[in-house]
Amino acid sequence: MHYNTSLLCDIYADTVDVVEPLLTNFGGRNSFAGEVVTIKCFESVGLIYKALEENGLGKVLLVDGGGSLRRALVNAHIAELAVENGWEGIVVNGCVREVDLLEDLDIGIQAITAIPVGAEDTQIGEVNSPVNFAGVTFLPEDILYADSTGIIISPEPLNAEALTESDEIA
């Protein structure tokens, strides 16, 4: 399904929070949405692997990597695991790597930028706790909507199915 964050913002202006425009698309799917699962970690991918081994149908993994630009928190293997387990997307306050492989996968991935250096495989951090970056506090079970224009979050699901790419707000 295609989500149009611009139209969703117009319709639900009083309901949604808009994430500051700091992130770029890296996955093969530019538009995605789902229930937020949060991870807070710094230059470590162990908790990310653990989370993505679970069924991710209808979910988006939101990783607060502290904005680190020194190590990538998502690589092709991690993204493939997410696809295999049905995750809708991954949003990273940090870096990704292997971008040519990521763009071929049927998953939404947004991150600050790319770097070739991988992160450590330790399980240090927090799972399903509130995280704050890009001007927004993300809570577990928030609903995240993303497209090429940006990312918004809502405490409740929005009626996005009523929207199409050709819809316009008067």
Swiss-Prot record:
Database matches in Pfam families: RraA-like
Protein name as annotated: Regulator of ribonuclease activity A
Family (UniProt): Belongs to the RraA family.
Molecular functions (GO terms): endoribonuclease inhibitor activity; enzyme binding
GO cellular component: cytoplasm
Alphabetical UniProt keywords: Cytoplasm
GO BP, one annotated term: regulation of RNA metabolic process
Organism for this UniProt entry: Psychromonas ingrahamii (strain DSM 17664 / CCUG 51855 / 37)
Summary of subunit composition and partner proteins: Homotrimer. Binds to both RNA-binding sites in the C-terminal region of Rne and to RhlB.
Broad class of the protein's primary localization: cytoplasm
Known function: Globally modulates RNA abundance by binding to RNase E (Rne) and regulating its endonucleolytic activity. Can modulate Rne action in a substrate-dependent manner by altering the composition of the degradosome. Modulates RNA-binding and helicase activities of the degradosome.
InterPro entries per record: RraA, RraA/RraA-like, RraA/RraA-like_sf, RraA_gpbac
SUPFAM superfamilies: RraA-like
Location in the cell: Cytoplasm
